Amino acid sequence: MALNIKEISEVIEKQIKNYGKDIIEAEQGSVVTIGDGVSLIYGLDKALMGELLIFPNDVYGMVLSLEEGAVGAVILGDYKLIKEGDIVKRTGKVVETPVGDAMIGRVVNALGQPIDNNGPIKTKKSKPVERIATGVMARKSVSQPLETGILGIDASIPIGKGQRELIIGDRQTGKTAVAIDTIINQKGKNVKCIYVSIGQKDSTIAQVVEKLKKFGAMEYTTVVNAGASDSAPLQYLAPYTGVTIGEEWMENGEDVLIVYDDLSKHAVAYREMSLLLRRPPGREAYPGDVFYLHSRLLERAARVNEKFGGGSITALPIIETQASDISAYIPTNVISITDGQIFLSSDLFMAGIRPAINIGPSVSRVGSSAQIKAVKQVSGTLKLELAQYYELEAFSKFGSDLDESTKATLDHGARIIQMLVQRQYSPLNQIDEAIILFAIKSHLIKWIPLENIRDFKTEIITFFNNEKDAKALKAELTKKLEWNADLESGIQKEIEKLVVKFTSTLKNYNPTIFGDEKEFKKLGK
């Protein structure tokens, strides 16, 4: 075939005409290995830790391992679209999430992208998901209560705004229920909520979102979901995305509540990524920096002073234990990072005591300074009385001959436990809690048969919301937020009246079973 000189010269002439002087500089490397959501890339010598990389087909990755001659990256999309030899480019950016009020009421993925079919999120502002926690001098002490609406928690394990309180227990003990009830109770309290789901079933999250909508909680809540079907890198990123969304509000002077459900699955996702990146395994095959994984996340919860916005982030991380073993690696790590823990017991849960809070190992290290006086004044002995009850109950199983004092302690303890039982999705306000705790403290519940205690608790709330004199006393307590002698005697008299009224409706009621008949006849007079 003869060469056509004219055609060749036309091609060369065309190329000279179209020659551009603009030089596009891009640092790029090539994929050496790819598999299980992790890639090893050669040629990106200047890549930074946490930097975003772009692969073919618009798939992004994040640098998590820097080695001599190669970098390890986790893939944030479908890694099956990437093959060996593909060109990878640096972006010079880190993972960011949209932030702002446009996130309220939305369900987003671990990258802050909407997954609720309600259209795009209309916000121009975004922030890097990884950042250093607020410094010591920017922080303020925890002194304002965060009301959970759960009597057992608000009374004996109080939580303050800016605190980190761990919810820990075996599977199916009501950990998520405690967190969801706390979110529902923030309605009308000017607290924005973020629920971060890590490794949960999508059907479970759909139910949670439906419940939040039903109780009007989605009006102030954002849900960040990295489900069980999502990759380990997305499950790893989800909590950092959640707290970044919350930090924007905190810096604008608002109070935020964030729930991480749960950090056990978060640690498992990080372990999976680390092992695939060939990092040396440590205890329980977790990498050596698994403590830092959670500490840098939970340290971002704080109450900041006015110079830095004056807002707060309160964190409720959830940890799932195996056979109630709180001495395992991840539980002990998170216990040491947080400001206290709420321990949920499977034995109590199976016995129908819900929320199944085991008061013994549960503690709030900073929350007591945030408790309102009305609750603090009447809840001081509650933990001690329950501790005495559990101790005596264990011994009472060995012998039937018990003295009157021991019997009284056991009877009172059993009634306290029934008073603390609370149905899900029915949070209490703090004044109702204070009145219920006063009824416990003044031992007026001793006249009520054990099987009727829960009904009596409901009656207390109804009585103080409807009866004229009782309603006036409740209004005064709401105004003052602390007890005085007049309030104590007035409310005691009203509860005594209620005891007489309530017991009169019970069939075959005999007050002598519970105490002296003369003492009973003096009630309410």
From Swiss-Prot:
Site-annotated residues for Required for activity: 362
Subcellular localization, as worded in the UniProt entry: Cell membrane
PROSITE patterns in alphabetical order: ATPASE_ALPHA_BETA
One Gene Ontology molecular-function label: ATP binding
Catalytic activity reported: ATP + H2O + 4 H(+)(in) = ADP + phosphate + 5 H(+)(out)
Pfam family, one: ATP-synt_ab_N
Keywords: ATP synthesis, ATP-binding, Cell membrane, CF(1), Hydrogen ion transport, Ion transport, Membrane, Nucleotide-binding, Translocase, Transport
Topological type in the membrane: Peripheral membrane protein
Protein residues bound to ATP: 169-176
Database matches in SUPFAM superfamilies: C-terminal domain of alpha and beta subunits of F1 ATP synthase (SSF47917), N-terminal domain of alpha and beta subunits of F1 ATP synthase (SSF50615), P-loop containing nucleoside triphosphate hydrolases (SSF52540)
GO cellular component: plasma membrane; proton-transporting ATP synthase complex
Enzyme Commission numbers on file: 7.1.2.2
Biological role stated in the UniProt entry: Produces ATP from ADP in the presence of a proton gradient across the membrane. The alpha chain is a regulatory subunit.
Subunit comment: F-type ATPases have 2 components, CF(1) - the catalytic core - and CF(0) - the membrane proton channel. CF(1) has five subunits: alpha(3), beta(3), gamma(1), delta(1), epsilon(1). CF(0) has three main subunits: a(1), b(2) and c(9-12). The alpha and beta chains form an alternating ring which encloses part of the gamma chain. CF(1) is attached to CF(0) by a central stalk formed by the gamma and epsilon chains, while a peripheral stalk is formed by the delta and b chains.
Family: Belongs to the ATPase alpha/beta chains family.
Name by which UniProt lists this protein: ATP synthase subunit alpha
Lineage of the species this protein comes from: Bacteria, Bacillati, Mycoplasmatota, Mollicutes, Entomoplasmatales
